Amino acid sequence: VYDAYRPQSAVDHFVRWAEDLEDTAMQPCFYPEEEKSRLFAHGYIAARSGHSRGSTVDLTLLDEASGKELDMGGTFDYFGAPSHTDYDGLTPEQRANRALLRDAMLRHGFRGIKTEWWHFTLQEEPFPDTYFDFPVRAPD
């Protein structure tokens, strides 16, 4: 699991970061093919998130024997075409791995989005209109 519940205050921080067009330090890693000014329009950043409703999870699959992540043909939180579920540049193995993840999540009541192969939201959300903002703390 890469990400699950995210307080609304953390989402607000992402929004402030995305609105600061001068801060492009992360562009080479996370959005080299995108203009930062287009991250909202392309759906990579939003003022509201299913993560803050406690109903969205970002995840991948691991190989049981090795404990290593399966090759999904792209990295988590990459804002660009390789993250799209229907990306044409995937190998057959990568396509099969994405299908395995998608099918497992669909079977368990989650739906994905087109722009992020790792992002799934519970279809029958218990709090569809509530954006929580309680803090998350590491255990002592």
Give the positions of each predicted feature.
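Cell-envelope/glycan interface and biosynthesis
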Residues: 1-139
